[in-house]
Amino acid sequence: GAGKTTTINLFMNFIQPSSGHVKVNGLDASAQPQDTKKHLAYIPENLSLYGNLTGLENLQFFAGLGGEKPDNSSAENLLQSVGLQSDAVHKRVSQYSKGMRQKVGIAIAKAKQADNLLLDEPTSGLDPKASNDFAQLLQEMRQNNVAILMATHDLFRAKESGTHIGIMKAGKLIHSLDSDEITLTELEHLYLETMKSESHAEVNH
């Protein structure tokens, strides 16, 4: 792969860097993993929640793992603040769509009050409305000074939601762009040219 998920895994200290350092708020993720994780919230592509628990119970459980213990009222407010309908708060997560599960993930991140959010393909498999709702939640978090690193193949969402865009290939950052200085059409062209050069390199190897 390009190395997007590997990059996130380095920040989470799931794997060790072969060289160099990974730092979060000035802390070395390898040398100070517990301190680093206090500043991080992570939402994987397939968020693992307990299907037999309600959205509220999942939020309270996972927030508790992060040292936060929202009461029922606070948990309900958090879930509704990310767009989960009030009648869904007390339903089992096994009845949730992927979009609803992602909203619980954002609520957990908000409950943790982490100032950095890592996302791995968060809009994969979402319908257009759910994807748009998720993008709006990210905008709100960014306005509240949360730094967001999102690994995605969705060029439209990258352009719409990001301030900076990086294109990776074979574990290397090939392009680093200011999202305000490139159009979606230009971004798509650059991405395709980058991927095409990779294919040619493989053929000519």
Residue ranges and their predicted role:
Residues 12:
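Helix-to-loop junction immediately C-terminal to a conserved catalytic motif
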Residues 20-31, 35-36, 175:
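Conserved ABC transporter NBD signature motif
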Residues 60, 64, 72-88:
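Conserved ABC ATPase "signature" region
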Residues 117-120:
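Catalytic Walker B motif of ABC-type/P-loop ATPase nucleotide-binding domains
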Residues 128-130:
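Helix N-cap at the start of a conserved alpha-helix in ABC-type nucleotide-binding domains
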